[in-house]
Amino acid sequence: FYSAMADVDKQQNVPLLEQVEEKKTKLPFCIFLLCNGAVGAGILTLTSAVGKVGWGMGLCLYVFFGVFAGFANMMLQKVFDYTKENTYSGIGKAIYGKWFEGFVEVIQFLYSIGTCCGYAIIIANELDLSVSFLTEGKEVPASLQFLTERSWLLVIATIFVILPPSLMRKITALRYTSIVAISGILYITIVMMYRAFTTHSCGLAEAANYVCDHAHCLIEANAMKANYTGFDECSLLCEGCEPDPVKSSLRSFIFNKDLFAVLPIFCFGHCSQVQFIPIVADMEKPTKKRVGTVVFFAYFLIFSLYVMNSMSGYFGFCGYSASNVLDSYPALDKLILVGRLIISFALCFTFPLYGYSVREAIVKMFHLQNTAYWKLALVTIVMVLSCMTVGIFFNDLSTVIGITGAIFGASLMAIIPSLLFFKWTKITDCKHKWWNYTLASFYLLLGLVMAVVGTVVTLVK
């Protein structure tokens, strides 16, 4: 009898375990998901960031932030193993209580808002340049002139493309647009490498068009709006001097206050901590070794993509790259135009994903689960229109990305993981507590420095 019962138990248990295992995500897909979680609109600002610190310092910062973000994820993995919570805010609640859960949700909420504002700026800029290409040499009727203006293009895209899917109750299908966005970034990277290989150092900057803004030469993709051709002419007539030797040549290391301005941009480009916890929770056999493998290869891919992209841009434009590297290339560049359209299309449908996350965060923070849907829709409309307004009045992507990375990126990557790791070390019987406290203190200190100094320098610039 007992033998028969044991056989029954065995038959019941084995299929159940196998069924759960089949639903888990395999290791290679986890690598792609984590890579996809970090790579986003921030990659477009990295060429400008490298141009401010030099290619050698840029490589050092890529290595540092890759290792820094990787160790932050491994700290979170230890806390995840202890709490078994499958969300970032969930492990915060398990370690510190409900107040810390609310704090994490607010940071994630503001981070999403900043990302959406960055998307709005990119969409507006790229649509503006795409339309200038399509209308080149053509007479636009006076009644349709507004369709060639950057602000109106963003308004139209927001109302007719971005807002409708943002108001959907469920937008699961839009999750696949991230694949389109990554494809667009890969395409842009290949084109940038091709353009770099077919010119000499700073060659693209020498042939680019410029405008004079407060006695500073700024690269202008639209030739119709430009005042000067080449940085030699612009420097003499706008700045009243010879071209800056630092900006007009390739430099390995540049030491000035701009270093503090680019730290938030590098931080933003490596932030994957929010996505990391759900990925590990859904991973097949999430042992320490397998999770470490995922983190290593994900950030190796991120490093490779960032280096190919930003170094190609820096080689061609040196220190003159626009804050969004796409805005450095001429509007009439057909190969870049394809990339502009792909990324604009993808971001228009990726934007609602963050809008949905913002709406869900508000529902959770204010306990609005049973609230009428029209009220939640109103919240979404206000959020989308607010980001659109930011996109209309700001066209400098590095400012939005800089502030978002400085305050919220530093919090998600360094400050929050360090606080969680502090408490985990205190309440568990882990070995080498002194090392854990030292590591957490380093992360907390550096996170606070990036948040404060990065924000101040970005706002001043």
Where are the predicted features?
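Extracellular loop-to-transmembrane helix junctions
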Residues: 47-85, 103
